[in-house]
Amino acid sequence: MPNAVIVADVIRGFFEQGNPLYLGRAARRIIPNIQQLLEREVASGSKIFYCCDHHAHDDPEFEIFPPHCVAGTSEVEVIPELAGYPGKVIPKRHYSCFADTSLDKELVALQPEKLIVCGVCTDICILHTVSEACYYRNYEVEVPVDCVTTFDQTRHKFALEHMEKVLGAKLVSSPFEVKITPPQFDIPASFLSGEPADIYFIRTVEILRREGLNPVATMEVFPSRAGITCGMHEALTLLSKILPEDNREVWALSEGEPFQRKEVVLRITAPYQSYGAHETTYLGILSQCSGWATAARECINAAQGIPVISFGARHVHPLAVGRMDYAAIVGGCIGCSSIAGASLAGLEPIGTIPHALIIIMGSTARATLAFDRHMPPEVSRIALVDTFKDEPEESVIVAQAMEGRLQGVRLDTPSERGRVTADLVKETRAWLDLNGFREVKIFVSGGLDPERIRYFIESGAPVDTFAVGSYISDTKPIDFTADLHEVEGKPIAKRGRLPGITPNPRLKRVM
C-alpha cells in the first residue's frame, strides 16, 4: 500500500517574506528537507496532499492572529519550490487538516499504509492534524522532525514530544543521501606491503604459506556501537587491489549508511592469504572514518536543518586532514575548510577571513575589503567580526564598507569574553537588519558540539551556519571487529560468536 504525505500550510503566506505570518529563516530551512521527502515518496508511489489555509475575510481565527492566507490571495498558494511534486490541493479553514475538508474521504479511498505529516506550524496545525490522525482515526503516523517548524522552538519541542509520547506518532529524521562521487583513493605501497598491519597477521599469513594452506574463508566486520558508515570506499579500493579477481565475493553497506551495534557492515569471501595481513588496515580505515562521520551526523541532527561545516583540520595530523574532512561531509556537513577534504568530496573548500589578516591590517573592514579585491568572485565574502570591536558594531561597519558585497559574518568570540551566546547572535541580527543588511548571514563557531548547537536552536538564535571543529576531529573512533565465520564453506566461529554467515539484507554485493 502507498503512503499518504500531508503537507500542511507550506504556502506563500508562511514561507515568503513580507506576509503577516512569515515564519522567517526557520521555514526556509525546511524547504530542501521537504523537497527530498516528496522526491522519495513520489518515486515510491505515495500520494501527496497539500492542505492549505483558505480563510474568509471575517474568519474568527483573525481574533487570535492577524489576517492571513485569505482565499483568493497569493498567500494561499503552495510555494514555488514544491511545484514539481504532483499532489492534490485541499483548502482548509481550521487548524486540523481533517476538519471540514475532503482529506478524510481521500484517505478512506486510498487506504494508505501510513501518514507522513510535514509542514507548519508544529504546535498548531501539525499537532492538531496528528492528534486527529492518531487518536480518532487510528492511522500510523510519522512526523519527520526536520520537515516541520514553528515560530517558537520551545513550543516546537513540546509539540514533538507530545505527538510522540502522548499521541503515539513516530518521530523520524530524513535519511541522508550522500551525494559524493566516490573518490579515487590512492592506496600507498606501504599499505599493500602490510606496513600498518599488526605483526601477528603478517606472521599468520607467512605460516599458512609455508604450510601450504590458503582456504577460501569468509570474514565479517561489525562495529561496537551504532554510527554512520564511512571509509568504505577506501577499504573497498584496498580490497580490490589485494583480492584475486577470479575468486572473491564482497558485500558491504554503502558510504553514509547508518549501522547498528554488531551489524555486519562488510563481508569478505576469498582465499585467506590474499587479505589476512590487511585486517588492521581496513578496520582502521572504517573505525576512524566512521567515528568522524558519526560525530558530524550528531551535529547535523542537533542543527535541525541549519547547515554545518567542518572546521577541524587544525586538530589532526596533516596526513589525516583529508580523510577527516571527507568523513565529516559524508556525515552530513555541507563542506569543510581544508583543500584536501574538499578535493576528496568533489567540493570547493569553505573559509572565512582569519584573525591573522585582520590583526596585520589593523582593521576588520580594511582586511575584508582587501579580501574582496584579491579573491575571485566565487569565493564567499564572510568576515570574522570579533577581533577589535563588539560583534554587532563590527558587523554593521564591515557590511557598510562592502556596500552590498558582504555575504556573511562569523562570530567566534573566545571563552575569555564569554563565547558566542544566543543573545549575541540575536543582537547582531537585529543591528544588521536595522541597517538594511537582512541578506548578510550569521556563521557561529568556537567550541561547538551537539549540546551547544541545541542551545542556540532552543534559544531561537538566528544562526545561518554552524562551523564545528574539535567535536568532529577529536571524536573517539568506533571499534570495528573482524571475525571468520566460514572456512571452505563450513560454518565456524570462535567461542562467543555464532558460526556461519550472519544475515543482513542491507548488504549489497560490490565485488
Each predicted region: which residue ranges?
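Conserved, mostly hydrophobic/aromatic
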Residues: 133, 262, 342, 409, ...
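Surface-exposed amphipathic alpha-helices with a cationic face
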Residues: 35-42, 108, 134, 243, ...
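Glycine-rich phosphate/ribose-binding loops and adjacent secondary-structure elements
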Residues: 356-511
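Ordered alpha/beta subdomains of enzyme catalytic regions
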Residues: 180-377, 405, 481-511
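Active-site acidic carboxylates
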Residues: 1-88
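Active-site-proximal loop/turn and secondary-structure-junction residues that shape catalytic pockets
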Residues: 94, 121, 147, 256, ...
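Active-site-adjacent betaalpha module
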Residues: 1-4, 39-44, 67-180
